[in-house]
Every structure is written in structure tokens, then in C-alpha cells.
């Protein structure tokens, strides 16, 4: 972002938040390419240079506006595959530029916010594991959780309208609206049943940005309610009767206050101090210390408000209210729950002694072994029952290369699931990968696993079999027994910014 700020001069267009001139700037697409969008379809298929030139971008935009879709039928894409390939080419290149440009105002705002709050290591806040220490500190004191699967918007126009509040450039929004509508139309001619899924896969960065900006709009209701609930907790009921405008705003938002006499009865809905909200991708969680009736009211109020103002249709089967004490929450590749940890304390007063039974709530995180085995079976590391199988590999791959690939997968899973309370499930996953690697090598050499290991020795798999704990104590040979005990407990890392593909059970 510092490089972008050097290129972005304070011109008159940028002072008014105009982003359309940036679409025709050469360095924008160079930055977009360098940021890891991957090689474009143009550079892969047609042999052009990796960097999208300004002339190519201008031609693509002109062709979009001049394209006559009434002369195109689904049979044309079958007879002329070059047309379908060009369609994906247009969307890929333009979406890369769009995704990079629309992120600029948000990135600049984030940088100024972090500098104002003097947050140095902001990358630690992006870690997925940073959510779990928050859950450990707060969820053990809560009772019920509202599990919500957020639906996608019914139309792409809703995404553009949401972005309009942040980007004040009508020309950029018009081009974005035209691109989204025309691309969906093109794709529906080729693959009618997979238009939206194909769009999200080929233009993942742009789609995620538009979707997250839309979700953040209706998540702002929690900020409003939190601020007002903080005010309500420090305000007497006599003063509240005079705040007609405030109650009118609350009534419009959540339909709580219907009559003046209902103020005292319904005030507790927005006074609840222990309401916590977290979200990752399409799954959001709302946890509270209140009762089941309290959570049902929140469900009705919030869902009604979101559907009315943001055109989101929440299916009743996608919203669950569960009690934390007897329900496991599947979130970010973990099964999280709050369980009672019984403990017995012996107390003695003079000659009399007695036992005191204490039950302490403890936040527990486990590795979901069944979905994880299903993910391994999907990529042919084992069968559906969890029995390791060999993977077909190319004959030109060396043994060390095969071991390195298996070992990297094992270390990544161990790294991501290091916060598990029980390591037994994780050890089983390591066993599956270890034996699958051995069977793959034996299959390559046309031998059995036992004969292969006996002939080459177990030192061949030494690097693969080494666990993270062994690596830790090889790095720090004088480690104490206290640190060894700490390692066996849960560890959350602050360098994980994406969920592991195998841990993402979909």
C-alpha cells in the first residue's frame, strides 16, 4: 500500500474519490499482477506478456459495451470455443483491476485507523487463531449461542448499491454494474446452472470484497446497539421517558418499543451487556448470557431487520439456537464447546474436614475427526473408513520430493490444529498421512511397505515423522519440563491468515 500511495498523486479526481481514471492506469494492473492474483488467462492461453497492457484493457472495455448479446445463443459457445474462452478472459482481467481499485479507499482508511490507534503489528489481528483466545475468555461465561448461515444477496445490483455508500464515483460504479450483469448473462448462456459458482471461483477476490462490504453494512447494527446499550445502562428510567427520538429510532430498528408502558418490560433487550458476535466467511455466531427466550427475540428482530432493509432471505433451517453446555459448535475447522470440569476441594476446619464439589466451565476445542477424514478421502489419502491408501504419482518424482509433499501437508494440519484440547484425533491424521506416504513410495518402487522400509531403512521418513514438538526441542535443546507441558496444551498462532483446505469441510 505504501507503493500505491507513491503512485497516487493528489489530483483533482482523487481528491473527490474518483476511481474511474485509475482503471486506465498502467501501474494498477502491474500492482494487481504482483499481488498474487495469479497469471491471467491471457498470459496462459495466448502467450502474451504477463503484465496486462493499457491498450488491452481499453479494448476489453470497448468490446463489453459494443457486444451484441441478442445474436449469441448457447450453441455458439459450443461451435466457437474461442468465444467462451474470451468471455472468461474479459472477466478475469477486468475483475483483477476492479478488485484492486475498489480496495484502495478501504486500505487507506485502515492504514490511517491503525496509525491513529498506534497498532504496530496489525497482521496479528488478521490471524484466524486470534478468534479462539477471545472465545476462551468470554464463551465460558455464556449460556446460549445463535448460529447463523449468512445467505448470498439475491442479485448483484444489491452489492453495487452497498458499495455506493463508500465509493462516490458514479462512472466506476456504472462500469462495475455493467460488468457484473453482462458477465452473469454471458455465463448463463454457457452454463446456466453454475453461473454464480463459476463467477465466484474465477473472480474470487472481487466477489469476496463485494460480499464482505455488503455484510459489513448490516453488521453495523451491532455497533449501534452496543453504543446505545452502554448509554442505557448509565441512564435512569425517568430520563429515558423524555428521549422520544431515541425510542423512535430503536422502534424502527428492532420493533422493541410499541407503547410507553412497555418501556420497562422491553428495555432489557438492548441492555444485555454480554452479547458477543463473531463471523468468518458466511458463518456468524451470536452468543449471550441470557435465556432461550432472549435469543429467540434477538433472532426474530435481527432477521426481520436484515430481510427488510438488506434484501437477505434467511432460511429458518439455517439459524440454530443451542445451549453451549450440551452443544458443540463447528467453527473454523474446530468443534468448540463449553463443558463442565468437575473438581473436588478438601477443606479442613480444626478437627472437621469436608469435601466441596466445584464445577468450572471450560472452553474446549477438538478436531472433528470424521469431517477431516472425509476431506482426506476426497483427495485420495485414505478411503471413507480412514484406511490409508497409496496415491498415484508421476514416475519422475524423487522419493525426497514425495516425502516433502506429504510432510508439508502433515505439518500444515498440525500447525492449524495446534489449539486442540485432545491430540488423539490429530495423531490419527498424522498416522494416515504417514502410512499413505509409505504406501505411495512402495507403489512407486513396486514393493510392499514392509519390504520397502526394511530395504531403505526408517531414516528415509525421519523428516516426515518428526512432529512439531520434536522440532521445538531440537531448536531449543535446553528446554525445561515446564515448556514441554505448555506445548502439550493448546497453542494459538498469530500467523495463520487462511483456513487450511483440508480443514475447511465443505
UniProtKB/Swiss-Prot annotation:
A Pfam family of this chain: Intron_maturas2
Keywords: Chloroplast, mRNA processing, Plastid, RNA-binding, tRNA processing
GO biological process, one term: tRNA processing
GO terms of molecular function: RNA binding
An example Gene Ontology CC term for this record: chloroplast
Places the protein is found: Plastid, Chloroplast
Function according to Swiss-Prot or TrEMBL: Usually encoded in the trnK tRNA gene intron. Probably assists in splicing its own and other chloroplast group II introns.
HAMAP family, sorted: MatK (MF_01390)
Keyword RNA-binding: yes
Organism: Uncarina grandidieri
Similarity comment: Belongs to the intron maturase 2 family. MatK subfamily.
Name the record gives this protein: Maturase K
Amino acid at each position: 500500500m505504501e507503493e500505491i500511495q507513491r503512485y497516487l498523486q493528489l489530483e483533482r479526481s482523487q481528491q473527490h474519490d474518483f476511481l474511474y481514471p485509475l482503471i486506465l492506469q498502467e501501474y494498477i494492473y502491474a500492482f494487481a499482477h504482483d499481488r498474487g492474483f495469479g497469471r491471467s488467462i491471457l498470459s496462459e492461453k495466448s502467450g502474451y506478456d504477463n503484465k496486462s497492457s493499457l491498450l488491452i484493457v481499453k479494448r476489453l472495455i470497448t468490446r463489453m459495451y459494443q457486444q451484441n448479446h441478442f445474436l449469441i445463443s448457447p450453441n455458439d459457445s459450443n461451435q466457437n470455443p474461442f468465444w467462451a474462452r474470451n468471455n472468461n478472459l474479459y472477466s478475469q482481467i477486468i475483475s483483477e483491476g476492479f478488485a484492486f481499485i475498489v480496495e484502495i479507499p478501504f486500505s487507506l482508511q485502515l492504514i490511517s485507523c491503525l496509525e491513529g490507534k498506534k497498532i504496530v503489528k496489525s497482521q496479528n489481528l488478521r490471524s484466524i487463531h486470534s478468534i479462539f483466545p477471545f472465545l476462551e475468555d468470554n464463551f465460558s461465561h455464556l449460556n446460549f449461542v445463535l448460529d447463523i448461515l449468512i445467505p448470498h444477496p439475491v442479485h448483484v445490483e444489491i452489492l453495487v448499491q452497498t458499495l455506493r455508500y463508500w465509493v462516490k464515483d458514479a462512472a466506476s460504479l456504472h462500469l462495475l454494474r455493467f460488468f457484473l450483469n453482462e458477465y452473469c448473462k454471458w455465463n448463463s448462456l454457457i452454463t446456466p446452472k453454475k453461473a454464480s459458482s463459476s463467477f465466484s471461483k474465477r473472480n474470487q477476490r472481487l466477489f469476496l470484497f463485494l460480499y464482505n462490504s455488503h455484510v459489513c453494512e448490516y453488521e453495523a447494527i451491532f455497533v449501534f446497539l452496543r453504543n446505545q446499550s452502554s448509554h442505557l445502562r448509565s441512564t435512569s428510567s425517568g430520563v429515558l421517558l423524555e428521549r422520544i427520538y431515541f425510542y423512535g429510532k430503536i422502534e424502527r430498528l428492532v420493533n422493541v418499543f410499541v407503547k410507553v408502558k412497555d418501556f420497562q418490560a422491553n428495555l432489557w433487550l438492548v441492555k444485555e451487556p454480554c452479547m458477543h458476535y463473531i463471523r468468518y466467511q458466511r458463518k456468524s455466531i451470536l452468543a449471550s448470557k441470557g435465556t432461550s427466550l432472549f435469543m429467540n427475540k434477538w433472532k426474530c428482530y435481527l432477521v426481520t431487520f436484515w430481510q427488510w432493509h438488506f434484501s437477505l432471505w434467511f432460511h429458518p433451517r439455517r439459524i440454530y439456537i443451542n445451549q453451549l453446555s450440551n452443544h458443540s459448535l463447528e467453527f473454523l475447522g474446530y468443534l468448540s464447546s463449553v463443558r463442565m470440569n468437575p473438581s473436588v476441594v478438601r477443606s479442613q476446619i480444626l478437627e472437621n474436614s469436608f469435601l466441596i464439589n466445584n464445577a468450572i466451565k471450560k472452553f474446549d476445542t477438538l478436531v472433528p475427526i470424521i469431517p477431516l477424514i472425509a476431506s482426506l478421502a476426497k483427495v485420495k489419502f485414505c478411503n471413507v473408513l480412514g484406511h490409508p491408501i497409496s496415491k498415484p504419482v508421476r514416475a519422475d518424482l524423487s522419493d525426497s520430493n514425495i516425502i516433502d509433499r506429504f510432510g508439508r501437508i502433515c505439518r500444515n494440519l498440525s500447525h492449524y490444529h495446534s489449539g486442540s484440547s485432545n491430540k488423539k484425533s490429530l495423531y490419527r491424521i498424522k498416522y494416515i498421512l504417514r502410512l499413505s506416504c509409505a504406501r505411495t513410495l512402495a507403489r512407486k518402487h513396486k514393493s510392499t511397505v514392509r519390504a520397502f522400509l526394511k530395504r531403505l531403512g526408517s531414516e528415509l521418513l525421519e523428516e516426515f515423522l518428526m512432529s512439531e514438538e520434536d522440532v521445538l526441542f531440537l531448536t531449543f535443546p535446553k528446554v525445561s519440563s515446564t515448556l514441554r507441558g505448555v506445548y502439550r496444551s493448546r497453542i494459538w498462532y498469530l500467523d495463520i491468515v487462511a483456513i487450511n483446505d483440508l480443514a475447511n469441510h465443505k
